[in-house]
């Protein structure tokens, strides 16, 4: 791993249907073994299910779900004087959306419905209404950060630029 500079952020093209970079990242997270067409089919079919079953705008449901699941605090492990402390740190927007999509996909995978399309549609709809396993995961993360608020003065080290 090079110590000279951080890797460049890759430019992700927006998806074809809704012209959204966020949805494109979500599709990339769904994708397994490079099968992007299948991942797109799963997501767009789940969107159709949301539209038919719940009579709701699927993209609006998706963006509400992502915003509801996105955490604003998390704990990072910091070593101080031979002890590790769980220090609450704010989550930047990009990481927040990455965590949200990961949690939604994990929660959807563990659901009892038969097909991933149904699982994803239901989890997205529940998350948009502040229910479901993904929302529970966010709340647990925030509880951990709240419980370790006393260690917030041990903020993680900032890397020096230019050295």
From Swiss-Prot:
InterPro entries: Ribosomal_uS7, Ribosomal_uS7_bac/org-type, Ribosomal_uS7_CS, Ribosomal_uS7_dom, Ribosomal_uS7_dom_sf. GO terms for biological process: translation. It comes from the Bacteria. Keywords: Ribonucleoprotein, Ribosomal protein, RNA-binding, rRNA-binding, tRNA-binding. GO terms for cellular component: small ribosomal subunit. PROSITE patterns: RIBOSOMAL_S7. PANTHER family: RIBOSOMAL PROTEIN S7. Belongs to the universal ribosomal protein uS7 family. One of the primary rRNA binding proteins, it binds directly to 16S rRNA where it nucleates assembly of the head domain of the 30S subunit. Is located at the subunit interface close to the decoding center, probably blocks exit of the E-site tRNA. Part of the 30S ribosomal subunit. Contacts proteins S9 and S11. This is Small ribosomal subunit protein uS7. It comes from Rickettsia bellii (strain RML369-C).
């Amino acid at each position: 791993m090079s110590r000279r500079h951080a890797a460049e952020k890759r430019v992700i093209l927006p998806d074809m249907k809704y012209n959204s970079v966020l949805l494109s990242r979500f599709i990339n997270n769904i994708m397994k073994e490079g099968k992007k067409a299948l991942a797109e089919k799963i997501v767009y079919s789940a969107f159709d299910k949301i539209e038919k079953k719940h009579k709701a705008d699927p993209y609006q449901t998706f963006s509400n779900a992502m915003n509801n699941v996105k955490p604003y605090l998390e704990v990072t492990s910091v070593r101080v004087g031979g002890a590790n402390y769980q220090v609450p740190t704010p989550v930047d927007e990009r990481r927040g959306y990455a965590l949200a999509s990961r949690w939604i996909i994990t929660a959807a995978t563990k659901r009892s419905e038969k097909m991933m399309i149904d699982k994803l549609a239901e989890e997205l709809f529940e998350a948009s209404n502040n229910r479901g396993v993904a929302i529970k995961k966010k709340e647990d993360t925030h509880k951990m950060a709240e419980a370790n608020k006393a260690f917030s003065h041990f903020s993680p080290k900032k890397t020096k630029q230019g050295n």
